[in-house]
């Protein structure tokens, strides 16, 4: 937070001749007592192509600064035309009004300045050598460009101005390590499950041929003529459906026999027929 705040700047003599001094009325506010003075400085930008033509018009020290709102008048001399390129004497340029505390700049205000001839004849037919007495300036006071900078004041230390490093990244590293351990545990569990599946698949492969053999034997063998290696009949290997079919056939044969016997008992013999006659 800035201890000194710029509240306003008023350009007093505007427009004015090129050779007239610059006059400003500056208002600022001081929130706390200051140990050092404030340095105000006005700079004229002589060329847009090089900093070598910049001129420091004036600088003053203001202090001691009481707490509250303060106002003062800043007057600076006009720039020297000999230090400005002839092609840029009559043109648009910039002036910079800045303030520093303890050698550190904390605010800068820039204004555009339009330099032109005061006579219409000179504007239409500009001479080779610029007559400075006929050049006037007009500061665009309604459109200033303000830039502020953070500095260390009396009640602030370097440690307070630059906050200490936080320990949050270390906690994040610990959380990342815990996540890595959890991922490793999950991978181990997946490997164990994969090994168990491999074992189960191996056992299934061993028993599979036996099942295939049992399925093939009933098709090639019957209960009456095929014997296994131990001499046992393979009729037992037949399915329950075949046993039921055999039982049904046996019952049909018995029924046929019974019906034949009944018919034989009812029909008379040839001898009996002759006796009735």
Curated annotation (Swiss-Prot):
Source organism: Kluyveromyces lactis (strain ATCC 8585 / CBS 2359 / DSM 70799 / NBRC 1267 / NRRL Y-1140 / WM37)
Residue spans of biased composition, Acidic residues class: 155-207, 239-265
Key words, A-Z: Chaperone, Chromatin regulator, Nucleus, Transcription, Transcription regulation
Skewed-composition ranges (Basic and acidic residues): 219-230
Family: Belongs to the ASF1 family.
Subunit structure: Interacts with histone H3 and histone H4.
SUPFAM superfamilies assigned to the protein according to its UniProt record, in alphabetical order: ASF1-like
A GO CC term attached to the entry: chromatin
GO MF terms held by the record: histone binding
Top-level division of the source organism's lineage: Eukaryota
Annotated protein name in UniProt: Histone chaperone ASF1
BP GO terms, sorted: DNA replication-dependent chromatin assembly; nucleosome assembly; nucleosome disassembly
Its job: Histone chaperone that facilitates histone deposition and histone exchange and removal during nucleosome assembly and disassembly.
Region ranges (Disordered): 154-277
Presence of keyword Chaperone: yes
InterPro entries the record matches: ASF1-like, ASF1-like_sf, Hist_deposition_Asf1
Localization terms from the record: Nucleus
